[in-house]
């Protein structure tokens, strides 16, 4: 049942369309409250959101359900997803809740949960919550009238997060003299990200810091790095930072205006952490989408790359299991486990800036250590989510491309965990061939899964 409700990053969909409706949100609040109401202590929940107009109504619905279940709710207002993870830990809350659809347009929204340690919930916990929500006849074990929770707002949540991120930056270093362009996507980081960088001494040029409820991710943020790249060239900045709507993802632009993806940043950070002795087992965790060049880079530098399913939660699960300190996704989710329990765009930016400060070299030189194989990713909108093996034509097309790549490339097909899309990725040594292979495969997928 849970697969009808939760995807790879919580619940997500179009506002006022199932499952992103107020009644589902109310039941989610009730179910999560009951699931995490354990023991006799005062039960607390931290709720944050991004800047979407619909965030207000979902915040109210979730709060009502949680309070009805006996949980005390602490509302932070708009804050990055990793800030809610941090506050859940630091405030000793039982649960953290984020209302956001990340990089999606404002018409969408989503709900995801963190446990008391600041980690995203495992599938089993989500299954238990979903079972209660989807059971129309479920008998809710309400507390008596004295056991109902109350809701309060916390006014200094953003300041607490800024202090936390600054404490993850070496005390003997500053950002004085650096010119930084930061694009906050008119999202959750619109206040905290520029302030944190300015307090560390940087000269900050702001983009996407005027949210109006409907302009989140609109021609800005991590999905539009060309915007920050143009600004970097215009103001001759040292680096550009593009965050997504909930600021758990980061895309970086060097001083020339060249966009660097998550793989290039992971290579840079892994090398620095290995040199500092901060990467246990010289292990980096990434997903199936990461470029083959990253795998070869780690091997050539005495390290190893462990691949997981796509989704930063699966990266984090593998990091916990293996004791890894660095992991991430090509899309820009970067996890520094020494400091955080989830992807954090601002924290990742500070780790990159630390390397720039310590090396005193431009980012273009530092990031040049990884040359990715040409890779083409095509998103195909689909009506059916059938197992690929049930469509022989797809398997035959994949086999033909793999044969032509001759072991010097990869083909990956996967369904999006949050949208009605099939992602077709081809990687190889020759850009023109890679593009042709991907386009041909995408046509087959579209035809077979309509």
UniProtKB/Swiss-Prot annotation:
InterPro entries: A-D-PHexomutase_a/b/a-I, A-D-PHexomutase_a/b/a-I/II/III, A-D-PHexomutase_a/b/a-II, A-D-PHexomutase_a/b/a-III, A-D-PHexomutase_C, A-D-PHexomutase_C_sf, A-D-PHexomutase_CS, Alpha-D-phosphohexomutase_SF. One of its GO terms (cellular component) is cytosol. Its EC number is 5.4.2.10. Keywords: Isomerase, Magnesium, Metal-binding, Phosphoprotein. Mg(2+) binds at residues 102, 244, 246, 248. It comes from the Bacteria. GO terms for biological process: carbohydrate metabolic process; peptidoglycan biosynthetic process; UDP-N-acetylglucosamine biosynthetic process. One of its GO terms (molecular function) is phosphoglucosamine mutase activity. The keyword GTP-binding does not apply. Activated by phosphorylation. Signal peptide: none annotated. Transmembrane segments: none annotated. Binds 1 Mg(2+) ion per subunit. The modification Phosphoserine is found at residue 102. The active site is at 102 (phosphoserine intermediate). It catalyses: alpha-D-glucosamine 1-phosphate = D-glucosamine 6-phosphate. Its cofactor is Mg(2+). Coiled coil: none annotated. Catalyzes the conversion of glucosamine-6-phosphate to glucosamine-1-phosphate. Belongs to the phosphohexose mutase family. This is Phosphoglucosamine mutase. It comes from Desulfovibrio desulfuricans (strain ATCC 27774 / DSM 6949 / MB).
